[in-house]
Amino acid sequence: GLLGLGYGGYGYGAALAAPAAVSYAAPAIAAAPAVSYAAPA
């Protein structure tokens, strides 16, 4: 993230950003099938 860029360059920023992106995406990925199953009902 931006803090990572400030505290050690692109590598550190990417190391912080990747887990954050996964943690944010995981609930959406998990919810998508539930929404698609619920939609017809």
From Swiss-Prot:
Q: Which organism is it from?
A: Locusta migratoria
Domain remark in the UniProt entry = The tetrapeptide (A-A-P-[AV]) repeats found throughout the protein are also present in many proteins constituting the protective envelope of other species.
What is the designated name of this protein?
A: Cuticle protein 32
Q: Which UniProt keywords apply?
A: Cuticle, Repeat
Q: Name one GO molecular function term.
A: structural constituent of cuticle
> What is known about what this protein does?
Component of the cuticle of migratory locust which contains more than 100 different structural proteins.
Keyword Transit peptide in the entry? The reply is no
Q: What's the superkingdom here?
A: Eukaryota
Q: Name where the sequence repeats lie.
A: 17-20, 25-28, 31-34, 38-41
